[in-house]
Each structure stands twice: as C-alpha cells, then as structure tokens.
Amino acid sequence: MFMQTKIFAFAGKGGVGKTSLSAAFVRILSESFPDKRILAVDADPAIGLSMALQMQPSLTLDDIRVQITENIERGKTTEAIELLSEARFHLLDSVVEKDNISFLAIGRPEAAGCYCKVNAYLKRVVETLCENYDFVVI
C-alpha cells in the first residue's frame, strides 16, 4: 500500500521547546517505525536539533545557497541545468544519516535580518526530498 509522506512542523516563539519536542518526536518515530525513512530538518539557525540528535552536518543549506550564488556571480554557473545539478549534488553532501534518520540543517545565514532566501530554499529542498521519506519533521 502506498503511504504518502507525513510532514510534521514544530513552530512557536523562542524557548517554548520546539527543538526538544522535535528531537523526542524523531526518536519516537524512529523506534516505532524502524522500517520507515525519516528526514529531520533543523530550520533553526541555532542548530540545536543537530546536537539533540547527535548528528553533525558538514554542510548546511545556507552553505549550499551561498556557494551556488557565488558561482553564479563569478560566472562559473550560468545554465539552469548546471544550477539544478550543482544544487542536487551539494544537497546530497549535506544530508547526514544514522539508522533510519536523515538529518539536514538550514545553518546560520551570515547576513543580518531576513531569513527569506534560505527559508525559500528550504521549502524547495523539502519539496524535492520528501518523496524519498515516510516522515519529515521540521
């Protein structure tokens, strides 16, 4: 039977326990459904979920976004197909896996203010990756 990806998002003001709830929920899903694939996404610039799950990414989504933007500005990447290929390649490098859990972090954008660009990129990444997972926890 086909199971559509279930997406869970924990949101709220700072300090209300989003990271703790997300980590506990990911662990419960992992233990309850060991045959299912789980994508845990840390959308908090503080990167607390990586510590809670003990999964350290070597590359974050913002690192990828910045690298691709720099390549465009330098003229290294110009074609849409090159951009898509480069983004997918780096995206695979940014996912950390342990047991049935895959982990992805948004990172900490260097620019002050709005997180709009990296959040828009995160949305696209989750849309792209979610078909490979049974559960996505953000």
Q: What is each PLM-predicted segment?
A:
Residues 24-25, 53-57, 118-120:
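Short, glycine/charged-enriched secondary-structure capping and boundary segments
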Residues 1-5:
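Phosphate-binding P-loop
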Residues 80-138:
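Phosphate-binding/switch loop-helix module in NTP-utilizing enzymes
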Residues 31-97:
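N-terminal phosphate/diphosphate-binding loop that engages ATP/GTP or pyrophosphate donors
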Residues 30, 54, 126-130:
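Signal for well-folded cores of large energy- and translation-related assemblies
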Residues 15-18, 51, 110:
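Short, flexible micro-motifs
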Residues 8-45:
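Walker A/P-loop phosphate-binding motif and the immediately C-terminal alpha-helix
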